[in-house]
Every structure is written in structure tokens, then in C-alpha cells.
Amino acid sequence: MTKRQNRMVLVALLVIGVSLAGYLGLKAFNENLLYFLSPTDVTKGRAPKDKDFRLGGMIVKDSIKHDGIKVVFDVTDYSNTFRVNYSGILPDLFKEGQGVITTGSLVDGVFMATEVLAKHDENYMPPEVADALEKAKNKQ
């Protein structure tokens, strides 16, 4: 092959390699993407099926029920409330009336959390949930 043909083959292989790397990177990103939803979003059916997502809001007063290491509590955005089941150790800041972000999936209409993060100040809550909480609070 001539030098020109060698360069063309090299450029073609380089373009194919970069395209393949970009495709695999985007695919991995989309597979690991966690959607963040409020209880209203979940109630309206916006939760992904058979995929983990984050549910955020405020812990409803008098809703926390402990059974050993298992915990059941309700999360609200002041418009809708959603039941959460969690098995594990809760963060120190977890308490009624506090903000919470849970990661998990829906199983038969109940959110089964695999991770619970307690909100410690206003900067911790993602803007989407803070906006949803503010809108719901203003409607009351």
C-alpha cells in the first residue's frame, strides 16, 4: 500500500475507535443515570419501571416505624405522600420533619430504598425537589 492508503486506513481506524469509545461512554452514562423524583412525580406515574431512581422530600411526622433493622416511613412534598421501606442503618440526621433523599425502586407500589441520605441544610436538597416542595407548600 502507498503512504496515502496507509494514512487513510489509519484515519478510518482512528475515527471508528473514537466513535466506539464515545458510544460506550454514553451507554455507560445512561445506564448509571438515576432520575430524581418527588412523591408527586411518582404518584403521577413518572417513575422508571424496573430501574432505580431517587425519591426526595420531607419525612412525615409520626410516620417512622422501626422493626429491628427494618424501617418504614413516609416521604412527602406537601402535595403527595409516598411510603418507603428501608433495611439498614439510618444516618444520624434522619428524623421526622427533616429532608431525605432515598435511592431505590418501586416494588408493588412501595418504594424499596437501598440508600437513605438525610438532608442537613437547604444546600443539600437538589433544586428540583426544593422547587417541588416550595410549590406544594405555597398551594396549602
UniProtKB/Swiss-Prot annotation:
It comes from the Bacteria. Heme binds at H120, Y124. SUPFAM superfamilies: Heme chaperone CcmE. The chain crosses the membrane at residues 8-28. Residues 1-7 are cytoplasmic. One of its GO terms (cellular component) is plasma membrane. InterPro entries: CcmE, CcmE-like_sf, NA-bd_OB-fold. Residues 29-140 are periplasmic. Signal peptide: none annotated. One of its GO terms (biological process) is cytochrome complex assembly. Its main location: membrane. It is a single-pass type II membrane protein. NCBIfam families: PRK13254.1-1, PRK13254.1-3, PRK13254.1-5. PANTHER family: CYTOCHROME C-TYPE BIOGENESIS PROTEIN CCME HOMOLOG, MITOCHONDRIAL. This is Cytochrome c-type biogenesis protein CcmE. It comes from Vesicomyosocius okutanii subsp. Calyptogena okutanii (strain HA). The gene is ccmE.
